[in-house]
A protein has these predicted regions:
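Repeated scaffold domains used in trafficking and secretory/extracellular systems
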Residues: 1, 41-46, 80-89, 130-134, ...
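Short coil/turn segments that connect the beta-strands within blades of beta-propeller domains
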Residues: 5-6, 51-52, 90-92, 139-141, ...
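Structural motif
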Residues: 18-19, 100-105, 149-153, 215-222, ...
Length: 271
């Protein structure tokens, strides 16, 4: 989910559309329609907004639309398929790919640069799968959040050089979750996620945790101050049990409750 210009944008995979809603979740219009034609979408997996344009990842291409839903064009990704959410900023795409490097920067003409640290695991196959990261653009930085390790990295958007790596494994809740995740033996191409979604608003990074301690929950958000040292400043407790995606504006959180199949608007409540 994204908040942009007093509107909420959400990817509806079942309808193969991007929904545009007001802040009370009234549907204003949709972007794309289900199909395989150039201006249509089939199983979109993620999207991002830069300026007045929406980029949607769909079957190995980025499809572009105006915020009002008019189709603009297509950019082919080639073989470097994203394995998590991507960021789109100033005509460049940023994402993680198990095939071509830890993090990819791709220009509109298809020029690719890889950057960042590749996290190492027991086998090459496990390393390939577990390097997935959420990728976000914020001002002149690219921020990545591992989906299974307590790591946040901040890069200069132009030089792609690392500015900071944050390890938040000392947060009590994260200590408990990681201990449980490590104790479970899974196939090399499977792992327990630590993070289910991320969002940036007003200089703060919001990270939605996957809590598998007694039963699966995704209802706690760690807040990081990215304007200073990017350390955790608070934990937010959401009222439901399992949220899939969310966005933030001011003191409001807009989230999709996966268990209830509903959109919810709530005011921040600190644990």
């Amino acid at each position: 989910m994204k908040y942009c210009g007093n509107r909420i944008y959400a990817c509806c995979m079942g309808r193969s559309q991007i929904l545009c809603m007001d802040d009370e979740f009234e549907l204003l219009h949709t972007i794309g329609r289900k199909g395989r034609a150039a201006g249509e979408l089939m199983d979109p997996s993620s999207f991002d907004i830069d300026g007045d344009t929406v980029a949607v990842l769909c079957y190995g291409v980025f499809k572009h639309y105006t915020l009002d839903g008019e189709f603009v064009g297509v950019t082919d990704i080639g073989l470097s398929l994203p394995n998590k959410d991507f960021a789109w900023s100033n005509g460049r795409y940023f994402y993680t790919s198990g095939d071509q490097g830890p993090i990819i920067s791709m220009s509109a003409d298809g020029t690719i640069r890889s950057f960042g640290e590749r996290y190492r695991f027991g086998t090459e196959e496990e390393t390939r799968y577990r390097n997935a990261r959420f990728t976000l653009a914020y001002r002149d930085r690219i921020i990545t959040v591992s989906d299974n390790l307590p790591y946040i990295e901040i890069f200069d958007r132009q030089t792609l050089k690392s500015e900071r790596k944050v390890d938040y494994s000392d947060v009590d809740l994260v200590v408990q979750i990681m201990k449980k995740n490590v104790s479970e033996r899974l196939a090399v191409n499977q792992y327990r996620a630590l993070v289910t979604d991320c969002n940036i608003s007003d200089g703060r990074l919001y990270v939605l945790l996957a809590d598998n301690l007694d039963k699966f929950r995704a209802n706690k958000i760690i807040v990081f101050d990215i304007e200073h040292d990017c350390r955790p400043v608070s934990i937010l407790q959401l009222p439901g049990e399992r949220y899939f995606s969310f966005c933030v504006n001011g003191q409001n959180i807009y989230a999709f409750n996966l268990r209830e199949n509903t959109f919810e608007k709530m005011t921040m409540c600190y644990e």
